Amino acid sequence: MAKQAIKRAKILAVKNNNKIGVLLINLGTPDEPSVPAVRRYLRQFLSDPKVIDVPSLVRWIIVHLCILPFRPKRSAKLYQKIWMPEGSPLLVYSEMLRERVGETLGDDFCVALGMRYGKPSIETALKKLQEAQCRQLIVLPLFPQYSTSTTASALEEVRAKNSFKEMTVIDRFFEEPHYIDSMTTLIHENLNEFQPDYFLFSYHGLPERHLVKSGCQLAICNRKNNCSPISSSNENCYRAQCFETSRLIAKKLNLTDQQYGVAFQSRLGRAKWIEPYTDKYLIELSKKGIKKLMVVCPSFPVDCLETLEEIGIRAQSQWQRLDGETLKLIPSLNAHPQWVNAIAKMAKKSLQLF
């Protein structure tokens, strides 16, 4: 059925000389690792009411009086540590992914990249697809696990700028077999040179209140335990989706429950975020005698500040101070051939929704 839908869509596209547009969305990055550029980026990012979900006046005070006077200088130094000759890793790898997905999908498709914050903007990406005479639009935010602060915010921006009459959205893929297989292959490739004592799956954290607002009916569950398997009562719970992704990858790797764990990084501010925290989890692992640790970041399909600096540098340094022998960070999927094919397959699969 799906193959017939894809075939019909391709015939229609060719007949009308119209392409199918694919919009890949990532979070965004500063234009350069300078204080002014980081300040511009953070101002746009943190002013989003879906990111800091408090009354507008309170948000303005937090952003303009508590964060922007101080954080840009610190963050710029962190970006400088990971900046590539070609530019921001997030942008470089995202563009590489866009290009290779386009090559894989072929001439009947046009693939564009839009950043929720910074450049290239979602509006710019949509204009490119319109100029390419695309008449159908597939939107794929590169956030495997759904959350209001990433996926919902990106989709809200798309709908505000979109002029396509036919649009389908892939709003999550945390349990998509092609994604899980891509992650598993990536890990297997790194196991050839390193055999860890333990696997840690580290995800971007969120304030706990975001889970409540997302409609998770298990938001008052015991956060010290693993989330329950995905069901109608927690299908929009970001934390539950992270645990489900980890379970699926661990199953593919034949890991026992004692061989891996899940933690959350990148917390900001004083509000309570979902636990356990990655930095504190490292302390617990060291107390258990773990020496060789492999860290995987499934919520980041593209390498960025949170993977390369927060884990690759800061967590690495922390692990050494804790007398750990080795902390190996698995690279993000970036433009891995299997991941490129996975995105192409997800895009084609979504055509049956038109």
From Swiss-Prot:
Keywords (A to Z) from UniProt: Cytoplasm, Heme biosynthesis, Iron, Lyase, Metal-binding, Porphyrin biosynthesis
Predominant cellular place of this UniProt entry's protein: cytoplasm
Organism name: Coxiella burnetii (strain RSA 493 / Nine Mile phase I)
Catalytic reaction(s) noted: heme b + 2 H(+) = protoporphyrin IX + Fe(2+)
Signal peptide: none
Residues the entry annotates as binding Fe cation: H204, E306
GO cellular component terms listed in the entry, alphabetical order: cytoplasm
GO molecular function, a single term: metal ion binding
Keyword Metal-binding: yes
Top class in the EC scheme: lyase
InterPro entries named among the record's database cross-references: Ferrochelatase, Ferrochelatase_AS, Ferrochelatase_C, Ferrochelatase_N
Protein name as it appears in the record: Ferrochelatase
EC number: 4.98.1.1
GO biological process, one term: heme biosynthetic process
Pathway named in the protein's UniProt entry: Porphyrin-containing compound metabolism; protoheme biosynthesis; protoheme from protoporphyrin-IX: step 1/1
Pfam families: Ferrochelatase
Stated role: Catalyzes the ferrous insertion into protoporphyrin IX.
Similarity comment: Belongs to the ferrochelatase family.
NCBIfam families documented for this protein: hemH
Keyword Cytoplasm: yes
